[in-house]
Amino acid sequence: MNPYEQYMQELAQQMRAELTENGFESLETSEDVSNYMKNVNEEDTTFVVINSTCGCAAGLARPAAVAVAEQNDKKPTNKITVFAGQDKEATQTMREYIQQVPSSPSYALFKGTELKHFIPREHIEGRDIQDICMDIKDAFDENC
């Protein structure tokens, strides 16, 4: 592994921990994603965070996801994450389930394997964190 790859891996580990330390399951391989989606209960809701190393993920996407997932009255059954740019195959497989234009960071909310709500990067970047939290809250309130 070259120094750049090592640096990015170490950086990503900290960014991944922001979610996993708050109850998100990290799916790091294509098989992890496929197995999860094949075995999810059709009545369960799953909140997916497509993580990223960009500034809007650090300052907006991860903090908003954690805050709403912890504090909202209605919560998804499951919380998972894949890391764009780091876990490329896992991210690609998740995007096949999402079936939207690739976007990171982004959020997806599923009921079973059916996509119920998607929030792309363009609805995260440059916005106020409270507005992002309200978007997530509204999706949870409607679908969880």
UniProtKB/Swiss-Prot annotation:
It holds the Pfam family Disulph_isomer. InterPro entries: BrxB/BrxA. One of its GO terms (biological process) is cell redox homeostasis. It comes from the Bacteria. Belongs to the bacilliredoxin family. This is Bacilliredoxin SH1478.
